[in-house]
Amino acid sequence: MFTLSDFDFNLPPELIAQTALPERTASRLLEVDHTVEPARLVDRNFVELPSCIAPGDLLVFNDTRVLKARFFGQKASGGKIEVLIERVTGTHTALAQIRASKSPGTGTTLRLADAFDVTVGERVEPFFTLHFPQPCLTLIEQHGRLPLPPYIEHDADANDETRYQTVYASNPGAVAAPTAGLHFDLPLLEQLDAMGVERATLTLHVGAGTFQPVRVENIAEHRMHSEWYDLPQSLVDKIAATRARGGNVIAVGTTSMRALEAAARSADEAGRPLAATQAETDIFITPGYRFRVVDRLVTNFHLPKSTLLMLVSAFAGVETIRAAYRHAIDERYRFFSYGDAMLLTRRDTPEAPQA
């Protein structure tokens, strides 16, 4: 079996992108070409993406919108707290992480952003239920702060509020951006439309668990966080039409990939075709996984020892990803959320887990 150490690599800290580039499409794109063996690595700019895909292909985007989910506040006693909304569960309720010197008990009142009070409800490990006095999406948007990933060393500013959202974000609910989509601007989308590339969207609300480290050497023991997704019938129909004309299904980002593959795996297990799905998923994709829907993947460069690095290794092959990451480091690509992108093609046969 593969172990956690198989997905480690040394990354110079200066390659961790701290800010977005001035233009979304100014990022670089490392195309991994599987038509030759070993895979050929092609250095491109992201604006060249249309030349890498064909009319009739289908790009699948995640249209989730990042909430201003971070709050500072205090208890009635005056003790300071930090709150990160994990998920909106109802008009006036949400699950949240709370950092405090002492965990608040049920019924405790918390003052957030010196603007409104919430009441702590039942514990849903590792989260707390919070009850809001008004619709929580409204209060979150008005008074919250945009949460940036832990490896970005500055607090969110006005530029982040624009650039840490995709241009097509429409369904609020995430606490982290589907970052592969950050490279697309409206002119690029219009160019893809004009050349006959199809587009479709799904929704997966990215949770803070996306940054959760893997703490066990035997990765089979890792338990994934759960996220909610909505795969609409319109997307199911477009996938069928793409297959019929011989096109590729291209996931924009690992969140789109996880939603597509989760729905397809559930359909397989139920003995039925892919169908519209609204569900929770804790799908954990590692080498040996059999991909059912996605042919190609646009994705950023991921953290060492992360579940997302395991996912792309399962998709393109462990050695291919190792070679691509070595190349990216040598060529000074920018890493993580505000970094550069890769275009990967699915390995034809699943890679068996190591013995």
From Swiss-Prot:
Family listed: Belongs to the QueA family.
Subunit architecture: Monomer.
Biological role: Transfers and isomerizes the ribose moiety from AdoMet to the 7-aminomethyl group of 7-deazaguanine (preQ1-tRNA) to give epoxyqueuosine (oQ-tRNA).
GO MF annotation terms: S-adenosylmethionine:tRNA ribosyltransferase-isomerase activity
Biological process according to GO: queuosine biosynthetic process; tRNA wobble guanine modification
Keywords: Cytoplasm, Queuosine biosynthesis, S-adenosyl-L-methionine, Transferase
Protein name: S-adenosylmethionine:tRNA ribosyltransferase-isomerase
Catalytic reactions of this protein: 7-aminomethyl-7-carbaguanosine(34) in tRNA + S-adenosyl-L-methionine = epoxyqueuosine(34) in tRNA + adenine + L-methionine + 2 H(+)
InterPro entries the record matches: QueA (IPR003699), QueA_dom1 (IPR042118), QueA_dom2 (IPR042119), QueA_sf (IPR036100)
Domain of life: Bacteria
Classification via SUPFAM superfamilies: QueA-like
Cellular compartment(s): Cytoplasm
Main location group: cytoplasm
HAMAP family, per the entry: QueA
Enzyme Commission number(s) of this protein: 2.4.99.17
One Pfam family matching this protein: Queuosine_synth
Pathway named in the protein's UniProt entry: tRNA modification; tRNA-queuosine biosynthesis
Record GO cellular component, one term: cytoplasm
Species this chain originates from: Burkholderia ambifaria (strain ATCC BAA-244 / DSM 16087 / CCUG 44356 / LMG 19182 / AMMD)
